[in-house]
Amino acid sequence: MRIAILTAVFHPELHPRAFRAYELAKEYAKQGHEVEVFLLTRIQGFDYEQLSKELDIKITLFPLYTRELGAQNVFQQTNPILRWVHWGYRWLLEYFLAGNLFAYSTRIAEHLKQTMKEKDMVIALSTPFMDLLGLAKYVHQLPNNTEKKTTYIADSGDPFYYSQQTKRALYFKWIEKWVYRHFDYLSIPTSDAIPAYAPLIPIEKIKIIPQAFNMRDVNLAPAPTGNIPTFAYAGVFYQDIRNPEFLFQHLCTLKEDFRFHVYLRHRDPHITSILNKYQQQLGEKLVIHYSVERTELLYSLSECHFLINISNTTTTQLPSKLIDYGITKRPVYSFDKHSFDPLVFDAFMHGDYTRAMEIEIRPYDIEVVTKQFIDLV
């Protein structure tokens, strides 16, 4: 089967959508399919030609973004007035135009028109939404008399207009509906997100296809030893939907020794200021790591006594790190700001994991997930 994957991020980036695109491409190539990855971001100094040979896939680069691995574009402005003006400008730009959505999606469509050969299945990964809009524009330009031979699948983790993180102008609702009309299916990771998509696309076109990983070649540490409670968090923090400050405030009240390892993808100035404040108070009890490669991360997580998951305050997203947590086979305490229970946390600190979260990882096996996509063709 001839398969194309359109994605903004790919290996070696440490991002859930990069993991998804990479695992799908690698597994489909392993199964003998002809795989082409259309990639919007180029990491400086990375050898994509060598990666193509290793995976037996084709990588077609679209030069929309070029950056260093782990780098994040952060605007630094010390003047409070200019900082407020910049924030207002960015907010208006995002609310009314969604940044460079229209310009970049048009460029994506043009690149696809020039480079896309006949495919049996095309999977476009959202985040950013311009992937979906770009492919929809490409499909819309196809001649009306073209025989339908390709199955187009939009893969999304969070709706664009109905996002609980970002407010946008009303017309984006109709743009999103127009986009989904050009896809045969919309795949989302969890059924909890269906109500958010129901106003945008017929229910029968929505398919539940979760995040996926290769679980066959995972190296885990032996059972953890040592008397000092050691626990970890991996992923990202946000100021709004996943703010960790309440947890750090509790940790500062504990008299006993512990080690809390925090694994983050990149440095965010707002989150860094929070971490720095509490690292001064907690000292060696708080250990912060950045940009740790996934296989190394899994091993490090498996060395801990237990793991913690700070849940989103949104209902449409399922953190992909929960799959990684399940792979490590370590107990997981999951909570948010409102459900955090100091007594349960204390029980975990003393080896009582009766309230551990149950994570069934079989549905997230890459072999299962790749078949779910193939079955749609």
Kindly label every feature range from the protein language model.
Residues E23, A103-T106, M130, A169-I188:
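Membrane-proximal helix-turn-helix segments that form the acceptor-binding/catalytic region
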Residues D192, Q211-A212:
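Carbohydrate-associated surface elements
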Residues M215-R216, G226-L275:
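Conserved catalytic-core segment of nucleotide-activated headgroup transferases in glycan assembly
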Residues L264, T272-E296:
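Nucleotide-activated donor-binding/catalytic signature segment of Leloir-type glycosyltransferases, i.e.
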Residues I43-A103:
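A conserved catalytic-core segment of Leloir-type glycosyltransferases
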Residues S300-T316:
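Acidic donor-binding loop of glycosyltransferase active sites
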Residues T146, T151-I153, F160-W178, M215:
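Nucleotide-sugar donor phosphate/pyrophosphate-binding loop at the beta->alpha transition
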Residues H350-V377:
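A charged, aromatic-enriched C-terminal amphipathic alpha-helix characteristic of glycosyltransferases
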